[in-house]
Regions:
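Mid-to-C-terminal alpha-helical segments outside catalytic/metal-binding sites
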Residues: 1-62, 118, 238-244, 252-292
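Conserved, mostly hydrophobic/aromatic
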Residues: 10, 55, 87, 100, ...
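Flexible loop residues that form catalytic
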Residues: 12-14, 68, 133, 196-197, ...
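Short aromatic-enriched loop/helix-cap "lid" or pocket-rim segments at secondary-structure transitions
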Residues: 17-22, 75-78, 113-114, 170-172, ...
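Alpha-helical scaffolding within the catalytic cores
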Residues: 46-54, 82-88, 114, 176-179, ...
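N-terminal cationic-hydrophobic initiation segments that often serve targeting/anchoring roles
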Residues: 55, 91-95, 120, 183, ...
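Active-site gating/metal-coordination segments in enzymes
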Residues: 61-62, 67-160, 164-166, 170-173
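Catalytic pocket-lining loop regions of alpha/beta-barrel enzymes
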Residues: 122-127, 136-244, 287-291
């Protein structure tokens, strides 16, 4: 299994400048217990080449860079406002190694949709990433529906954090069961429920079981802490095709080592860390040696 070149579907801009700006923006924000325990900062690399070297060492072929937009629930401003150009510096310089996901601001719907259109059609982004909590609206709010319609039009997935949120924001808005309502209205929309959905893991599994266009993101948790129900689902006939590995900034090498230690079948491991992402996001990857 160690020879499988992994694809991380969930990461952030990791330049020193971006991380410094993010750390400065968080001053005066509510910092919760878990965020303090993790050090309160995303990882950074001194250069794109340093990041590529770390990816190579861990056996990671591609990393998705999200244009994350996070509204402060406490102070009411966009305290993470990733710019399209910040993602493009990755995807234009190393298009074989980095994949872009556009962002969405439900307070600026028209502008967001225009930028998503440009990101996908002109720059080859493979989808959209949403962090809803600080905006204080649920995933099935009417202000989210223009995004879902646009993703259906462009035939790209929308990845969204579901479950609890680490930052000082209400977690209730990210209940995975809300995806059920969304899919009732957009049955062809391809959705990734990122961050495992904890503590509502079984809600996310149930929605994935019901709808053929829902995937579960195995990210933001070190695999040894995954709920047994999720590991069992990954190893199941249905779940092996509907789970995607990612890190959300956690260390690649240790994450993959822990994932291999869960006892997944080799074919399941390959699907979770690579093949499912290739299929869902329609990625161009090298054909394995010996393939027809």
């Amino acid at each position: 299994m160690e020879d499988v070149r992994a694809i991380d579907f969930m990461y952030y801009v990791a330049t020193p400048e971006f991380i410094a700006r993010w750390n400065k923006a968080k001053e005066g924000e509510l910092v919760c217990r878990m965020e303090r325990a993790l050090g309160g900062s995303l990882p950074s690399f001194p250069s794109l080449e340093a990041m590529l070297a770390a990816m190579d060492e861990a056996g990671v072929e591609k990393v998705f860079i999200t244009q994350c937009k996070m509204w402060s629930h406490r102070n009411h401003w966009m305290y993470m406002d990733t710019q399209l150009e910040e993602v493009l510096q990755y995807t234009t310089r190393y298009p074989d190694r980095f994949v872009g996901l556009a962002g969405y601001n439900p307070y600026r719907i028209t502008e967001s949709l225009q930028e998503i259109e440009r990101a996908v059609r002109q720059h080859g982004f493979r989808g959209v990433y949403v962090h809803i909590y600080g905006f204080d609206i649920p995933l099935h709010d009417r202000r989210m529906y223009p995004l879902y319609a646009k993703c259906v039009e462009l035939n790209v997935p929308v990845s969204m954090q579901v479950g609890h949120v680490l930052e000082g924001m209400p977690s209730e808005h990210g209940r995975p069961i809300y995806l059920d309502r969304i899919l009732c209205d957009f049955p062809t929309l391809k959705v990734v429920g990122a961050h495992t959905g904890w503590p509502w893991v079984e809600e996310l599994i149930s929605v994935c079981y019901k709808w053929e266009t829902v995937w579960i993101g195995i990210d933001a948790w070190m695999p040894k802490y995954l709920k047994p129900e999720l590991v069992q689902f990954m190893n199941s006939r249905l779940g092996q095709d509907r789970c995607l590995w990612g890190t959300n900034g956690l260390p690649w090498k240790q994450s993959l080592e822990q994932l291999r230690a869960l006892g997944l079948k080799p074919e399941v491991y390959r699907k979770v860390v690579r093949d499912n992402a290739v299929e869902l996001f329609q990625l161009q990857v090298p054909t394995p040696a010996g393939s027809a």
